[in-house]
Amino acid sequence: MEATARGDVPKTLQTIAYISIPNSADLEFLLWDLQDAIAAYARLSGTTHPSPVDLKADDADAAVDGIVLAVDDAFDDEAMTAVEQILDRLKNTDARAYVIVQALSKNTKQADEALDRLYRACLLRDLPWCDGVVVCAGSDIAALRHSPRMGLLRRPFSEAMDKLVGAIRMGCSIEHAQLLGGGNAGSGEADGMVRAKPALPAPIWHAIIKHLGSRSQSNI
């Protein structure tokens, strides 16, 4: 799944849409983390960042230079239809397409299938595919919202998200952004995606997430 030639050409993104399908606490957290990091890097570098556009609320003529689709691997036909309706509005616009996939299952087969469907949908609409991040953490990752971004629990996902931030800031694919930034382009997978896993063994990870989730609920 290689990035298209246009996806490897840097482009200044003035506007960008962030879409989560379905609307879930986990996907909203991942998009929040991405947007927060984009804003932080812009402040540090003294540059501007793409203005968010709400395609669900704005009129049909709202134009965007890029889109980030956040989905989970329980990606069914209903979710695909919703994605296609959004992508139809961007058809032939040269908008950069990025994705975040939350892998809920233990293996990545379902996530790979979701990626393939999204990639083909972008290809059919002549939208440059610019890769993204697969978060292999199971469910309830939103429980990490108040954990330090570069602490033990969030660090692997933050580092993966930072690569996506770099790509969006350059307006190109993650792989090409790594090359332009002097990083290791080979750190991603063969399909250009960056896959992030917890730094802790699965049993410990799930126990911590369950504990954090319970504590968050008790504080509501």
Model-derived features: positions:
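A short beta-strand-loop structural module common to alpha/beta enzyme folds
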Residues: Y41-A60
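C-terminal and late-domain segments of enzyme folds
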Residues: P156-I220
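Short N-terminal or domain-adjacent regulatory/targeting segments
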Residues: M1-Q14, T81-Q85
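Short, charged N-terminal beta->alpha structural module
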Residues: T12-T47
